[in-house]
């Protein structure tokens, strides 16, 4: 798990929420509590992605990063898999709750997609230079786009849609 990268995600989402969305939108859909759950879900899924990546990279890391590897050195693969599932399930419970609160349950599918994509990347896409890098770039962008979806879209009704889009 890369704590600095996780902190960057938190900072970017907080900056977008409090310095952009809350200033531009009269009333956003996410309360501070639901925003906390949203950010925590994003961080937990990202941390889970790091764990599954380390699990699949264990053999390569034995050679390339023997001193810094964690799986089967500091943490067994079995325990790492437990944490992978625990983090992702916890994140999904949180984001499903937030999706229900904002009455957009289908938004939670984006987080299911992110979990699947991180697993797919770790399993076999990271060896494909272009596809792997494009997927990771897309998932990073999606972590920012998601905030707009969850915080702005639920507050836009059909009458105000054209005003919001073209302002």
Describe the function of each predicted region.
Residues 1-167:
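Multi-pass alpha-helical membrane architecture of UbiA-family
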């Amino acid at each position: 798990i890369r704590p600095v990268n996780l902190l960057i995600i938190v900072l970017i989402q907080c900056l977008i929420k409090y310095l952009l969305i809350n200033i531009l939108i009269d009333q956003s859909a996410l309360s501070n509590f639901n925003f906390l759950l949203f950010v925590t879900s994003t961080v937990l899924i990202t941390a889970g992605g790091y764990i599954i990546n380390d699990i699949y990279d264990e053999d390569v890391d034995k050679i390339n990063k023997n001193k810094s590897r964690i799986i089967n050195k500091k943490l067994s693969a079995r325990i790492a898999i437990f944490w992978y599932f625990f983090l992702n399930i916890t994140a999904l419970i949180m984001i499903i709750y937030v999706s229900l609160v904002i009455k957009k349950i289908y938004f939670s599918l984006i987080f299911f997609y992110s979990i699947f994509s991180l697993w797919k990347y770790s399993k076999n896409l990271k060896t494909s230079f272009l596809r792997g890098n494009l997927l990771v770039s897309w998932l990073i962008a999606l972590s920012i786009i998601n905030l707009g979806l969850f915080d702005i879209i639920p507050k836009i009704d059909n009458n105000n849609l054209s005003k919001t889009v073209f302002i």
